[in-house]
Amino acid sequence: MVVINGVKYACDSCIKSHKAAQCEHNDRPLKILKPRGRPPTTCDHCKDMRKTKNVNPSGSCNCSKLEKIRQEKGITIEEDMLMSGNMDMCLCVRGEPCRCHARRKRTQKSNKKDNLSINSPTNNSPSPALSVNIGGMVVANDDILKSLGPIQNVDLTAPLDFPPNGIDNKPMESFYTQTSKSDAVDSLEFDHLMNMQMRNDNSLSFPMSANQNEVGYQFNNEGNNSMNSTMKNTITQMDQGNSHSMTLHDIDEILNNGIELGNVN
């Protein structure tokens, strides 16, 4: 690395091979070594002023960049002013205050909440939830509630009484006792089953396997002599594998008529 007037230089080959610190080639063309990191553009004065809250350089300070260009050209700022014709350059590099930065313009923030509270049309009017518009007039709900009078106390523990005439002038008992004749169990005749004794060893079960055309029973105690012979023969002749649940009407018909069904293949 060759240092001339505080500026570091190195040849092109050493810079490409990342050996600029070891370069001592004075016989080759040299290049200025750029400092590591991001090159600063603002001057030191603007950096210090940026730390305060009321100063904003806004990226317009190029004093440091211009000073490096002058150093590369080997000219001073006075010579640069004469050459460019701009006699109003910033002299912060000479210790004077930088003129690139500008103070922030503080804008007056409009307080929207205060404006809304002042200009609100419903400021002096009752709340919408507590007022009612009747014929273009706003009436408070409190006045309406007072006109209704006190609420009568209702005993919630008392049972509810049905009307004496019932519903549609029909007595209420008819809604509980009225049943169809087809569903009434009392209308069926179970004379053949009255002699049976319900015991643990004598039970009658109804298989639930589905077949729409055939029916079948399974009688667990075929030696029950108290049953009618017609009922016993009918139950034993039914197919146990192809059966479905029977209605009370079918049982009544079997018991009364003694229908015999053959085995189903």
UniProtKB/Swiss-Prot annotation:
This is Metal-activated transcriptional activator protein AMT1. Zn(2+) binds at residues 11, 14, 23, 25. It holds the Pfam family Copper-fist. It is found in: Nucleus. Residues 1-40 bind DNA. The lineage of its organism: Eukaryota, Fungi, Dikarya, Ascomycota, Saccharomycotina. Residues 119-128 have a biased composition (Low complexity). The keyword S-adenosyl-L-methionine does not apply. Residues 103-129 are annotated as: Disordered. Keywords: Activator, Copper, DNA-binding, Metal-binding, Nucleus, Transcription, Transcription regulation, Zinc.
